[in-house]
Regions:
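Membrane-integrated ABC transporters
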Residues: 1-71, 88-129, 148-152, 169, ...
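Short intracellular "coupling" helices and adjacent cytoplasmic loop segments at the cytosolic face
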Residues: 21-30, 166-197, 261-296, 387-401, ...
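An intracellular "coupling" helix at the cytosolic face of ABC transporter transmembrane type-1 domains
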Residues: 51, 190-202, 256, 260-263, ...
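Transmembrane helix-loop-helix hairpins at lipid-water interfaces of multipass membrane proteins
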Residues: 57-147, 216-251, 328-335, 339-349, ...
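Cytoplasmic coupling helices
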Residues: 150-169, 176, 235-279, 295, ...
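Cytosolic ends of transmembrane helices, especially the final helix of ABC transmembrane type-1 domains
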Residues: 289, 313, 333, 354, ...
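ABC-type nucleotide-binding domain
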Residues: 403-696
Length: 696
């Protein structure tokens, strides 16, 4: 479910955001747009709740109606009790008998009094009837409140699930490039933060407004039945206008302040998380960083809190001034009603009815202002969710123009189960927000069944090239062809099935061992034998068999108290097992053995060489011993391919590959013999390449 377009609402951080009015003439247009934005957000939330479970909306509507009517009914009944009690008491004081009133049925007493029979016995019976009715109303009110609590809590959990799923579904299809931008993380953090409570809170508040409006109308109708009391209701409502202005003004100020200081909040969360992150706690303790992070948290909080405190004080001073004026008005009108009682123009029950109605009008207006302002503030925060849901996805299939032969073109499908030809044609790439070319004019052909090894120092662009091949990014310039067709023309999800990949920062999942391996190909039914075979091929079987529950052992302690924490080398073997488990056409391994010793690494590479069959295999590795099994080696420097060929060809060429290989060989020997290992030298002929604009 998509939200309104970005920039629809004032306050959006979008170039299309609606500007504030610069003159009086622009105010009506601004207010119109403001209201349309407010109701746009509100109906967006209603849509979420309705899609979650329609019964939530229906139940809350019925509850709002009943809660709106019960207080005024209760107030009229209480007034009637007091008036009847006063009349019965007066008649009893004059000697009228009241014995036997318990024998009169309530509805008979009501009928008799309506017909004009007002003896003391009937009045006493009427008092009892109203007391019983008050009890019934109270029971109904309690039941309705319990129902409201149940509906809000149950509905709230369902709505949280719905919004969280919306966020996860959106994150599933968003471009990887989005995750490289701080602005994206701000949207993601804000959306996640508000997802837990804002939608159901706004819905509940909206129905509270409906309840309050019903009550307000009933109280005003009660007041206008008395001459001149309509003026009291009008004055109270007029006095509410300054309260509304202050409330809405500071709600928006609060929202704008929180959004403006979102960086401070992220920093506070970051520093507090550092203190409890299980992966960092050892280093934080050993380097005595605890006090540093606590000081930075407190310093950031002080900056954040200083502005927030000023807003809170200013808001409450405004409320104080308005409340003093409003209470003076109450005092005046209460005195008028009391005078009418002393003058015999009203009964005691009438005093209770009208003073409570007057107070209730004020309370309803205050509640309307407060709840409406809360809804307004909540809908502003919902902008965070809308902005995230509206995040543009650019990695989508590029379809040809419709034609008579193909009026509705569909994305191309990959021919799975075969070897593929992959061609990079003058591919260049810059990360979003940067002008530096991470890849610069790459032209390479990967033939079916080849074993390709990418070598080069850190920052050469090896991993970025893999991300473009798997279409996690699209090239800034040039194109990539798969079997003669532009990679962008393929269905993205179908394309992903073609690759079995281990990233350098591979996943460590808090599930069982077997699930960690089976995640390598979720389209296959989990096969215990195939899982064991993959673990054996990655040399993970040895340590798995020693675990308490073998392949069913829970890993990590996020959810299970007895979860097992593996070493980084063991995790890497599980990641490699995932690649062996996959039935993908192209295997890609980005530094797959970085945490393994050279002997274990060579065993893994030999396994891949034996088991890959006719699959195309691409390795990224710093250890050049793996390159000896390759049919093609690409040597990369600063985003360019500077050498290409097999191991023998490149060694005979005595270029950069020869230099890196021999340096690494000497390093291994030096480490073995206990000498100082030589460093990899930078290549003097290939300095960093930048574009002419804004070099980084």
């Amino acid at each position: 479910m998509m939200g309104p377009p970005p920039g629809m609402f004032p306050g959006d951080k979008n170039k299309n955001a609606i500007p504030k009015p610069k003159s009086v003439k622009e105010i009506p247009s601004y207010l119109k747009t403001l209201l349309s934005g407010f109701f746009g957000r509100l109906f967006y939330i209603f849509g979420i709740v309705w899609n979650t479970a329609p019964w939530i909306m229906i139940a809350m509507s019925a509850i709002a109606l009943v809660q709106g009517l019960l207080p005024i009914v209760s107030l009229h009944v209480s007034s009637a009790v007091l008036n009847a009690l006063q009349s019965a008491y007066s008649m009893a004081q004059q000697g009228a008998p009241i014995e036997g009133f318990l024998k009169i049925l309530p509805w008979k007493a009501i009928v008799a009094i309506v017909e004009g029979n007002t003896d003391a016995v009937l009045l006493a019976s009427l008092v009892l009837s109203f007391v019983l009715l008050t009890f019934v109303i109270r029971v109904i009110s309690n039941v309705v409140n319990l129902l409201q609590n149940a509906v809000t809590r149950i509905g709230g959990e369902l709505v949280v699930r719905q919004v969280k799923v919306m966020i996860m579904e959106k994150a599933k299809v968003l471009d990887l490039a989005s995750f490289d931008l701080p602005e994206f993380y701000e949207k993601l953090e804000n959306a996640n933060r508000e997802a837990g409570h804002r939608p159901i809170q706004i819905l509940s508040s909206t129905f509270s407004v409906i309840t309050t409006v019903i009550q307000l109308i009933a109280y005003v109708v009660t007041l206008v039945t008395i001459p001149k009391m309509w003026a009291a209701a009008l004055v109270i409502m007029v006095l509410a206008i300054p309260t509304a202005i202050v409330n809405f003004y500071y709600r928006r100020k609060n929202f704008e302040y929180i959004r403006r200081r979102s960086k401070d909040r992220r920093q506070m969360n970051y520093y507090s998380d550092l203190m409890v992150n299980k992966d960092l706690v050892k280093e934080v303790r050993m380097f005595h960083l605890s006090d540093t992070f606590i000081d930075r948290y407190q310093s950031t909080f002080d900056k954040y809190f200083a502005g927030l405190r000023k807003l809170i004080w200013r808001e409450n001073i405004g409320y104080l001034i308005i409340n003093v004026i409003t209470n003076c008005a109450y005092l005046f009108f209460f005195a008028i009603i009391a005078y009418n009682v002393f003058a015999g123009q009203m009964m005691i029950g009438d005093y209770s009815l009208y003073t409570n109605s007057l107070m209730s009008v004020s309370s309803c207006i205050a509640a309307l202002i407060s709840i409406s302002a809360s809804i307004y503030e909540g809908t502003l925060f919902i902008d965070n969710l809308i902005a995230f849901i509206n995040e543009k996805q650019t990695v989508v299939p590029v379809l040809p123009e419709p034609s008579e032969q193909c009026p509705a073109p569909a994305p191309a499908k990959v021919n799975h189960g075969t070897a593929h030809t992959i061609v990079f044609e003058h591919v260049s790439f810059c990360y979003p927000g940067s002008t530096r070319r991470v890849l610069d004019d790459i032209s390479v052909t990967i033939r079916p069944g080849e074993t390709l090894v990418l070598v080069g120092l850190n920052g050469a662009g090896k991993t970025t090239l893999i991300k473009l091949l798997t279409r996690l990014y699209d090239p800034t310039e040039g194109r990539i062809l798969l079997d003669g067709r532009d990679l962008r023309e393929y269905d993205v999800e179908d394309l992903y099935k073609m690759f079995g990949i281990i990233f350098q920062d591979f996943g460590k999942y808090a599930v069982s061992v077997s699930e960690n391996i089976a995640f390598g190909d979720i389209y296959l039914d989990a096969d215990p034998e195939k899982i064991r075979e993959a673990a054996t091929q990655s040399n993970a079987d040895d340590f798995i068999n020693k675990l308490p529950n073998g392949y069913d052992t829970a890993l990590m302690r996020y959810f299970e108290q007895d979860g097992i924490e593996l070493s980084i080398g063991q995790w890497q073997k599980l990641a490699i097992a995932r690649a062996f488990y996959s039935e993908s056409d192209v295997l890609i391994l980005d530094e797959p053995t970085a945490s393994l010793d050279p002997i274990a690494e060579q065993e893994i590479f030999n396994q891949f060489d034996r088991l890959r069959a006719d699959k195309t295999t691409i390795f990224v590795s710093h250890r050049l011993s793996s390159a000896t099994v390759a049919t093609k080696i690409l040597v990369m420097e600063y985003g360019r391919v500077i050498e290409e060929g097999d191991h023998r060809t490149l060694m005979n060429k005595k270029g950069r590959y020869h230099e890196l290989f021999t340096t690494q060989a000497k390093r291994y020997l030096a480490e073995h013999e206990g000498e100082n290992a030589p460093e990899f030298p930078p290549h003097p002929q290939h300095p960093p390449r930048f574009t002419t604009k804004n070099p980084e």
